[in-house]
Amino acid sequence: DSSVKSSFDKFFSEKDLKQILNKVSSKPGDILFIMSGDKKNTLEQMGSLRVELAKRFDLIDHNKMCPLWVTDFPLFEWDEDEKRFFSMHHPFTSPKPEFLNQLESDPGKVIANAYDLVLNGNEIGGGSIRIHSFDTQMKVFELLGMNKEEYTDQFGFLIEALKYGAPPHGGIAFG
């Protein structure tokens, strides 16, 4: 049977539904999960569904080691309740160089110079290249909503050091 049975098919024409099925190379008997809503929540829910289905259908080879480097994190996460950005990693993580020019114009699109090592779905290590520019660090503190007193009290030693220059540096921690 090649018919579509869903709670959302009433919102699409038959032509639209066929285009969706063709786009994903769907065949009769396939099941598609389509979700809409807030991107972060949608991705988390679909990820949980993927893992649950893999467990139920015994699709996970527990004898196989599957390491993965995750390298394209957003630098910031927007909190809708507080109407401000938070650091995804920490406030000293540098943006990837090609995203520096977007810090002011589109901070939500800036990608962090960070990395996690994941083994079979579990994070086993994480790190980043740190900010080594005074101006960039000040801009990040500003985007995080920190005032001068706040960042000076907490990180005055770092700010002072950055005024004199620092080499690019980074690290990774396991555990």
Language model: regions and residue ranges:
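Structured aminoacyl-transfer and RNA-binding surfaces used for tRNA recognition/handling
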Residues: 1-174
